[in-house]
Amino acid sequence: GRGACVHKDDDFHIIEEALMSADAVIVGSPTYEFAPTGNFKVVCDRIGPAHDKTFRGPAIEQGIAEGKDPSQYPDVRSTKPRVGALITVGGARTENWLSLSLPNMHEFTFPMGIDVIDQYKYFGAMNIEHVLGRPDVMERMKTLGSHIVEALNAETEEERIRYRGDEQGICPVCHQDLLTVGFGGN
């Protein structure tokens, strides 16, 4: 099938079309109690499995092979390469209150295979009335945008997906400091 969401009475189609058209995305969310907002999570859940490249790619190939009308299989733009950056903002004065925000925000990019090339945690947002009062943060956002442009203009796939963020983290894939310790040999 097409992999379309069963919910039709909202504006998700606007977000979906913007994503299908985009070569890059910069996604931001406030942090409430360690994590992104519930509304952000709902969008992630709506993208979720229905937009997963591992589902859509084979469904598109099968639809084309069977000579189906494009309206009968997922949007072919689903599998195009994209890059992204993530930004989370919290009012707390310590970074710890944002600890699960960026890891959770990867739920937005992961299903569609969007390569996250930069990310930023802006904490202490309540210390100054407006972000414009933080030249260091404004400069970092300018750099983040430049990283997106660099990735889009890259001549090789390796250079396109290269992580450009300041924080390398423990994980070599998501560059987060979140580490899961499993028991039972996993």
Residue ranges and their predicted role:
Residues 1, 11, 177-180:
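Secreted/processed peptides and extracellular or luminal domains of membrane proteins
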Residues 1, 23, 172-175:
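Cysteine-centered iron-sulfur cluster-binding motifs in ferredoxin-type domains/subunits
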Residues 1-5, 135-138:
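Charged, often glycine-rich, active-site loop that binds/positions anionic groups
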Residues 3-109:
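Helix-loop-strand module that forms the ligand-binding subsite of alpha/beta enzymes
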Residues 99-185:
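Glycine-rich phosphate/pyrophosphate-binding loop and the adjoining helix
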